[in-house]
Amino acid sequence: MSESQNFFIAYYPSSNRLAVFLDLSDRLARDKTLKGQVKILDAAGKEIKTVKLTMPGGKGEALLDLPDLPDGTYKVVASLENLAEKTSFQREFVRLHFPWEGNTLGLCDKVYPPFQPVKHSGKTVEVVLRRYTLNAFGLWENVISAGKEILQGPMEIKGETSQGPLKWKTGTVNLTSRPTAAQCLARAESEALVIETRSLIEVDGCMRVEMALLPGRKPQEIRWLAVSIPLKDELVSLWHVMQSGSIRHNPTGAVPSGQGVVWESSQTGNGPMLGTFLPYIWLGGPERGLAWFANNDRGWVTDDNRSVQVLTRKGRTLTLDIYLINRPVTLSATRKIVFGLQASPTKPMPKNWRLAEDIPMHGGSNGYWGIIPHFAGKYPADRDYTFADELLIARKTGRVNQKFLKEWVENKIKRIIADNPEQVEDRTRHVYSGMNSISHRGKKPQLIYFEEHAQDITSPEWEVFQDEWGLKQYTERAWSRQQPGTGAAINGCRSYQDFALWHAFQWMSRGLGMYCDNTYPRNWENVHLSDAYVREDGQVQPSACIWELREYHRRMWCLQQDCQVLTEFPLLKSVHMTNGNILPVVTWADISLDNEWAWKNGEEPFPPEVLLAE
């Protein structure tokens, strides 16, 4: 008997790996172990690889290294040795190679305006509009943002052991820089633990903090350990907190009032995230502020019933404490932790930005630009960029090539979706409208709809890279072959960046900017590819994939600068983030579309403090 139920695979083309998972725990006692093997076969039945599979309690998982497979369809067959009934399990995956794989578009070591080269002197790093002084924790001692100090005192690592408060012996701060980034190496020691930090500050002032917590010379029980960020209360009237996976209804507006503890993370829902962790917190005012963020709490030691983020006001100081440890533990091995810090504003606003008379158009759908799958598609039908060429001609001449459009409808739209007359009519209207619209744009900026958070599930690229790009660890790998209205949510990993940027280049080099719809943190559950991890209780803590989304948008913005010299038309990049305004991502945009939601179900206008915070 052959079946696929309870047998899952995930194929990762970029690393030539295959994950397999088989769960027969409902057929076996917990104290029993199944043994078997997994075979990878090509279309002719030739064996590519065979591995043993051990399944204690009826569950087993393996991660296989494969060769770089040629194009084709492959079978994955699992068979068991000691199951009462003879059963085999089978799945298939496809490998196709694409011209965009492994490209370096947008990966540049240049500094484009309005950013400025990163400079350092002593322990101080300067970026556009901001100056940071670093300390032995690899954190900020001072933050001068838009001419004002926003910290009330140095950021610190505070904690307590069974012997009392932690006492630190700090070492030197080693700073180096190049035009695009500065690096800080720092070390602080106590008897209970040692902290080694590598902090990288980039041109937009975003600092990636990679922190290692090591057992000290005299390990002790650590009761709590926190990153403490004291801010000047008079400069912090607003806040913005993100729940991973939510583009709307995130806490924003006026910062909580009062003295003492005014807020803690256990008070705010965090969606699929486990415990009380929230991935993004910004505190500030209309002109300046400071953001802390992380993909998740990997490497932390926490109690799900206690807050890991606490906001306390004492006199004129508002302190954000991030509890890396909030339950007793004695370190026995190195724990690695990654988070980010960024002060705002991240770059100067364009001159006379309030007087802009023309808002670039995008149409709200990519059907206007010859893309058949609405919203989630990235390229014209059949990857035929003659449609983009005709858009360029219509824009330059002010005339529409009616013959081309008629042939496009007949040879592309009616052929590809012939079985759906309603969609044929809809896509036909869209391409005529898009071509007519751009013929009147002239030198005004024009954007195309380029969905950020999802990919077309009918595309061959998705069929091959679905496990690498999707948010789930394993799926049924069964997707609708009908033209979808949207698509499957993606994570922004390197191979997806390569794919999207390759097609973005085709559009931008022809003078069309990007409208990136639905930009917000997601919940990536893949423990093989992301910061997601399996907790002690066996549950998976997802990753908000903020770092991946940051790299995606940075690459696209840098590519836009490279493409500007290739076209006479002005290029702009827009993100639609609604209520997901996170500094490390939206920095890399020229336009931000906000507030596509309703305050109190539309019964009241947005309060001024919400508009200021957003």
For the regions a protein language model found, what residue spans apply to each?
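Short, compositionally biased P/S/T/A/G/V-rich stretches that sit at domain boundaries
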Residues: 1-17, 23-25
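Carbohydrate-recognition beta-sandwich/jelly-roll modules
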Residues: 1-4, 30, 49, 56-60, ...
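Beta-strand-rich binding/interaction modules
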Residues: 18-24, 28-52, 62, 74-78
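Flexible loop/turn segments at secondary-structure boundaries
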Residues: 375-379, 453-458, 521-526, 580-584
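Active-site-adjacent "subsite" loops/lids of carbohydrate-active enzymes
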Residues: 397-509, 595-596, 601-605
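Glycan-recognition surfaces
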Residues: 456-487, 544-614
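Active-site neighborhood of glycoside hydrolase catalytic domains
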Residues: 495-583
